[in-house]
A protein has these predicted regions:
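N-terminal leader/linker segments that precede catalytic domains of diphosphate-processing enzymes
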Residues: 1-163, 170-187, 192-235, 241, ...
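Short aromatic/basic micro-patch
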Residues: 246
Length: 295
């Protein structure tokens, strides 16, 4: 997955110079990272779990009892040493390296692999550690065509405030599966009843490696479709979303193609939806399908 992302990073550099528009710009923007690039590999035991900047690596020299440096980067042994990672992250947060989110995430070398440690969500981009999330396409069949529920992110959100979002989306916290996370987030974000949430169908995975202001985001998105009854109306429960609107899917298609109204990674999940719904076809669909493939 990350080798593919590095290849797309080269295209992203070229696209930036040309001022590329349309759907491809979203895919390339989310795959602008070159790995390891100027970063150092971060390992737990013998497994590469992340990539850190030279600045963060210097800060980590304050924990020689846990962190070891060699020609290949830096590493932390498993067991009690890996368990110390959460405390190290908290100290770094207090020193201003990143914002503490008070939500633990599992640390894995690859999706589906064993949990090697846990670390606060706020530290993930700083360490370049893989994060997993869920995104739900809340779809409605109406006489005039397919519609999609669209949420607007709250203005106080640190990440992409006021942008448009899915009806349900969120990170997979430590100890939960994507399906369990979907049910949890569905209730919290949209008042989605459990009896509806269980009908969601997983339709794929999308991975990317992206350099952003907060650091290196290596994300794997678990994508779901849920066909909702016409009489269901989502309502915000946790102040993360301020309102929901039901849009014709064609309107969503045009907004993604022509604007930056949606949160950066939501665009990728929607592009996949447009392909599956036949709104993007031909060579463009094939290019996008291959670029989005997380395998």
């Amino acid at each position: 997955m990350w080798h593919r992302a590095c290849g797309l990073a080269k295209r992203a550099d070229a696209a930036q110079g040309r001022g590329m528009h349309g759907f491809r710009r979203h895919v390339l923007a989310c795959n602008n990272a070159r790995l390891p690039g100027r970063r150092l590999t971060f390992r737990i035991g013998g497994d590469v779990v992340g990539y850190v900047t030279a600045e963060l690596a210097r800060a980590l020299t304050f924990w020689p009892q846990h962190i070891h440096f060699d020609g290949g980067g830096l590493s932390i042994r498993g067991g009690r040493h890996a368990a110390a990672l959460q405390g190290i992250a908290q100290d770094l947060s207090e020193r201003g390296y990143f914002r503490w989110r008070d939500e633990a995430f599992d640390v894995r070398a690859h999706p589906g692999g064993p949990v090697l440690a846990r670390i606060d969500r706020g530290a993930l981009p700083a360490f370049g550690i893989l994060a997993e999330g869920v995104h739900l396409n809340g779809l409605v069949r109406r006489a005039e065509g397919v519609h999609l529920w669209v949420g607007r992110r709250a203005p106080h959100k640190t990440l992409d405030p006021d942008k448009l979002d899915h009806i349900v989306a969120g990170g997979v916290p430590a100890g939960l599966t994507p399906v369990e996370t979907l049910a949890k987030e569905g209730d919290e974000e949209a008042g989605l009843p459990a009896e509806l949430a269980v009908r969601a169908e997983k339709v794929g995975e999308i991975g990317y490696a992206m350099e952003r202001e907060e650091g290196l985001r290596r994300d794997l998105l678990h994508c779901f479709d849920l066909w909702l009854p016409e009489d269901f109306t989502p309502h915000p429960n946790d102040h993360e979303v301020v309102a929901f609107e039901l849009w014709p899917l064609a309107r969503v298609h045009d907004a993604v193609r022509d604007t930056d109204m949606f949160k950066f990674n939501v665009n990728l999940v929607l592009i996949d939806l447009f392909i599956r719904q036949g709104l993007i076809v031909g060579t463009e669909a094939e290019w996008l399908r291959q670029a989005l493939n997380a395998e």
